[in-house]
């Protein structure tokens, strides 16, 4: 919202302070920084005229150097990761094996003659980008819009924001990388419709489905594979060279493969020291990889409800390969948008959004989505989903829960992430307790729970109880990050176990209802002890034992039959007496009562 300063008549107009806002693409391999003025984007160059700045940090001669292609690489992959996760993931451990402090309880690297956290090291990249922008623009740069992968969770996003703040940058907004690319095309081309963003980088593949309508960008589905990218193409070519020309499987061959890949972007043949590769063979080699990306894109469309797409936006340097455009067109028969250099599309969108947030009367809005469902634990270990996967953000959802036991003075809240039905199969995000509640009958206390996700994708959960005026709020920062492959694994397990999960949930709900019936009947019998004959007590006890045995057998049909048998055999002779007491006990209770 624009703030307008109101002055007294005749008061001199002071010169407005100008704050420079830039867009930053903090990439795994390379980073870029750009500024937009009048919706015209300019990418900031280094002193040696480079736009793509290697995301590397090196410490030599008591100085930290960024962009030297040496030292610590791919630090972006470490955002949001725990020490255990890094140690147990070879691909991550190999990045930091020469730096990591194994004695620490958290992720710390021995770097620059001291222990540094990931955010502190990443801040050096932001500092370097900021300095390059200030040199070229000859003014201080204080604000930025920064892009992050669509699947970055709260912990990873939080570390990006911390790194930027340590570099002296105010983060105006974090936006998903595919959203940024779509934003660049939406404003530059004035597009409206539904678009598929195809982002194939060096080591990862991301695909998103976006609606773009009247300046509103909404991600409606995301998918991808974080182990698929240009590096795989290099490996396939290297293997071909090893088999065809008896080369050694080493780094030199891999570099030669990369050189061949880049050469074949603009020519039909590659030759080097009697090693050759023609474009036709090259395309035959990489067709399986391109096919995998297209299958993932089709699956993402299914998740989105199979909308008709109006175009495909290309992102990532690998999409310079002509065959990718051709195969995408064959598969989807829509326009391929590649007017903006795929290497630069993301930073273009970030720069345009930075201008949008600092310039009056630009009304475009970006909306990302929740990658995995968020919910709470209910009584019995059941998961109640509060915000569903692929829900657009920002979002706020309010639900009411109640106590399940008499004289309960606290409610425990267990916040979860995942698509499964039971707590044991989902990821714990946070736990907290609302204490100091007045001791009252079960169901009398009502707690209002609010799940809120802001525009940066940060989740906060609050609980409020009106009678005691007690409240608690927690900003959820998961213990470890979640990337594309983990999201895909969660979804795959959810689909694979859908029937079993549904059956498990129905069984648990049936058990809870049966246990509630047993509790209330036994409580009622104590109140009716003088009204019931010994024969009636025996019948009730026997029927309740049948229900208990069925519960122990974990057989839903058996439980339902035992409950049905109890109700039918006690309906006429006992219903009136029992209802005198249990009608009050059951008031306000339902299956969704939580711990």
UniProtKB/Swiss-Prot annotation:
SUPFAM superfamilies: Actin-like ATPase domain, Heat shock protein 70kD (HSP70), C-terminal subdomain, Heat shock protein 70kD (HSP70), peptide-binding domain. It comes from the Bacteria. The keyword Chaperone applies. Signal peptide: none annotated. Keywords: ATP-binding, Chaperone, Nucleotide-binding. GO terms for molecular function: ATP binding; ATP-dependent protein folding chaperone. InterPro entries: ATPase_NBD (IPR043129), Heat_shock_70_CS (IPR018181), HSP70_C_sf (IPR029048), HSP70_peptide-bd_sf (IPR029047), Hsp_70_fam (IPR013126). Belongs to the heat shock protein 70 family. Chaperone involved in the maturation of iron-sulfur cluster-containing proteins. Has a low intrinsic ATPase activity which is markedly stimulated by HscB. This is Chaperone protein HscA homolog. It comes from Rickettsia bellii (strain RML369-C). The gene is hscA.
């Amino acid at each position: 919202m624009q703030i307008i300063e109101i002055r007294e008549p005749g008061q001199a107009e002071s010169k407005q302070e100008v704050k420079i806002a830039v867009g930053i693409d903090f990439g795994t391999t390379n980073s870029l920084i750009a500024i937009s003025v009048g919706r015209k984007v300019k990418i900031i160059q280094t002193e040696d005229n480079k736009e793509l700045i290697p995301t590397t940090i090196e410490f030599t001669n008591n100085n930290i150097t960024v962009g030297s292609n040496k030292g610590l690489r791919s630090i972006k992959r470490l955002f949001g990761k725990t020490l255990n996760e890094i140690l147990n993931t070879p691909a991550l451990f190999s990045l930091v094996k020469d730096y990591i402090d194994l004695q620490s309880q958290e992720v710390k690297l021995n770097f620059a003659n001291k222990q540094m956290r990931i955010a502190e090291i990443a801040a050096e990249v932001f500092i370097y980008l900021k300095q390059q922008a200030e040199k070229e623009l000859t003014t201080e740069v204080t604000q930025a819009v920064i892009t992050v992968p669509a699947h970055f969770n709260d912990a990873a996003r939080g570390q990006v924001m911390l790194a930027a703040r340590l570099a002296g940058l105010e983060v105006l907004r974090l936006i998903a990388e595919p959203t940024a690319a779509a934003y660049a095309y939406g404003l530059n081309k004035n597009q409206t419709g539904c678009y598929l963003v195809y982002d194939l980088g060096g080591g990862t593949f991301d695909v998103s489905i976006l609606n773009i309508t009247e300046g509103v960008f909404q991600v409606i589905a995301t998918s991808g594979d974080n182990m698929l990218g240009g590096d795989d193409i290099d490996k396939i070519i290297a293997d071909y060279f090893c088999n065809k020309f008896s080369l050694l499987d080493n780094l030199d061959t891999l570099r030669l493969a990369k050189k061949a890949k880049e050469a074949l972007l603009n020519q039909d043949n590659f030759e080097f020291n009697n090693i050759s590769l023609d474009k036709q063979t090259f395309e035959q080699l990489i067709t399986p990889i391109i096919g995998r990306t297209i299958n993932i894109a089709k699956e993402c469309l299914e998740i989105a409800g199979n909308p008709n797409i109006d175009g495909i936006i290309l992102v990532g340097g690998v999409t310079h390969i002509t065959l990718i455009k051709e195969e995408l067109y064959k598969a989807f028969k829509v326009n391929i948008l590649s007017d903006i250099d795929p290497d630069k599309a993301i930073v273009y969108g970030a720069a345009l959004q930075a201008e949008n947030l600092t310039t009056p009367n630009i009304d475009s809005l970006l909306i990302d989505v929740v990658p995995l469902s968020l919910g709470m634990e209910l009584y019995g270990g059941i998961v109640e989903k509060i915000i569903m996967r692929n829900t657009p953000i920002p979002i706020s959802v309010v639900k009411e829960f109640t106590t399940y036991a008499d004289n309960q003075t606290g409610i425990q809240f267990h916040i979860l992430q995942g698509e499964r039905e039971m707590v044991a199969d989902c990821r714990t995000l946070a736990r907290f307790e609302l204490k100091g509640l007045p001791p009252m009958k079960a169901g009398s206390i009502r707690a209002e729970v609010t799940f809120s996700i802001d525009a940066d994708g940060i989740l906060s959960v609050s609980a409020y109880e009106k009678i005691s005026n007690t409240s608690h709020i927690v900003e959820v920062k998961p213990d470890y990050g979640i990337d594309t492959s983990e999201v895909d694994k969660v979804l795959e397990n959810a689909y694979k176990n859908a029937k079993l999960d549904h059956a498990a949930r129905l069984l648990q709900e049936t058990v809870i209802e049966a246990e509630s019936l047993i509790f209330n009947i036994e409580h009622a019998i104590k109140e009716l002890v003088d009204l019931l004959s010994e024969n009636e007590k025996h019948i009730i006890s026997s029927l309740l034992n049948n229900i208990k045995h069925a519960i122990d057998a974990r057989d839903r049909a058996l439980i339902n039959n035992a409950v049905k048998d109890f109700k039918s055999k006690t309906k006429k002779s006992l219903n009136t007496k029992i209802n005198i007491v249990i009608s009050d006990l059951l008031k306000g209770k339902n299956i969704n009562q939580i711990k």
